[in-house]
């Protein structure tokens, strides 16, 4: 989260430690115009997104729940608040092209993000941690390099 401002984030909150509604209210005194949810396997995030959005606001869902249950989510609030909900699946060729174009601009410090490099021996555990199927903190940047011999954690070099 410490790197979030370098990527243009106005407010980044670890919801495991801080109530996002209180943090948003303290930061801007109102609800958000746009809430972007990119969490994976976080069923409660949808309810939080609806709570954080202002009436007439927009919620972008780019993370999948991994569950049919959504604790704290009341669909009626979408109607009452007249929210716009957009789904975003960013795993097509056009999205990869845009991502690569953004990387080469140097606009954001991607090289400073913590990463983990995995070879064939470490790939399965890395994918399991990133999918939430194995205990551990998933890296922000997971890299498969067939010739990698060990895990590298920390900023990219």
Where are these regions (language model features)?
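Rossmann-fold dehydrogenase core element
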Residues: 58-60, 72-113
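Short, glycine/polar-rich helix-capping loops at beta-to-alpha or helix-loop-helix junctions
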Residues: 1-3, 68-75
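Glycine-rich nucleotide phosphate-binding loop and flanking beta-alpha elements
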Residues: 19, 42-43, 67-68, 92, ...
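Helix-to-beta-strand junctions that scaffold the AdoMet/dcAdoMet cofactor pocket
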Residues: 53-55
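C-terminal hydrophobic helical "lid"/dimerization subdomain
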Residues: 47-51, 92-157
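Short strand-turn motif at the edge of the Rossmann-like AdoMet-binding core
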Residues: 39, 63-66, 88-91
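Adenosine-nucleotide cofactor-binding segment
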Residues: 1-48
């Amino acid at each position: 989260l410490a790197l979030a401002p370098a990527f243009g984030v106005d407010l980044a909150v670890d919801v495991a430690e801080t109530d996002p509604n209180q943090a948003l209210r303290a930061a801007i005194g109102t609800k958000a115009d746009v809430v972007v949810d990119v969490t994976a396997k976080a069923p409660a995030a949808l309810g939080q997104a609806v709570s954080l959005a202002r009436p007439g606001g927009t919620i972008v869902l780019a993370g999948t729940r991994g569950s049919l249950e959504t604790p704290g989510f009341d669909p009626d609030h979408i109607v009452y608040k007249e929210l716009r909900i957009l789904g975003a699946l960013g795993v097509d060729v056009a999205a990869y092209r845009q991502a690569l174009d953004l990387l080469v601009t140097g606009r954001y410090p991607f090289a400073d993000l913590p990463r983990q490099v995995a070879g064939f021996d470490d790939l399965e555990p890395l994918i399991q941690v990133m999918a939430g199927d194995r205990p551990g903190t998933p890296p922000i940047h997971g890299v498969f390099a067939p010739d990698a011999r060990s895990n590298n954690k920390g900023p990219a070099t």
